[in-house]
């Protein structure tokens, strides 16, 4: 009979550890902002509080992201925890803007997940290649909504998404809180 309470203690310990490890996969918002500014210094990334009009009460802070390139985005934080990052690029885009979008996406991966430059660049390029291929296939099929979408799931409950359409591109990192 003594084993039953011990089993509950062990299960409770592992249950308490799992959410902590998922949440620790991403850094806090302040750390993300500083690291992204450093990683994408040449893009002159700037953050400003977004104006949100809503009747619903929210514990989220939303920031608009601007760069000196034609790339913008949003950052959503909850209780100083990273919740969501999105980068946007309008199409048709110049080669310079496309490069800036890819660089900002890779820099966000480094800032959010602590990946090295090679891993983050490879992940961003692999997702971009898939999205381009899926967009071409969507056009060939004559889909009603023409888009190339791809997503990846990384440890800690974090999801990565990339979507290409004829009018824009969007890259997202979504934390386990979202």
Where are these regions (language model features)?
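Short, exposed beta-strand-loop hairpins at the edges of beta-sheets
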Residues: 149-168
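Bacterial N-terminal signal peptides
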Residues: 5-16
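Short, solvent-exposed mixed-charge patches
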Residues: 176-178
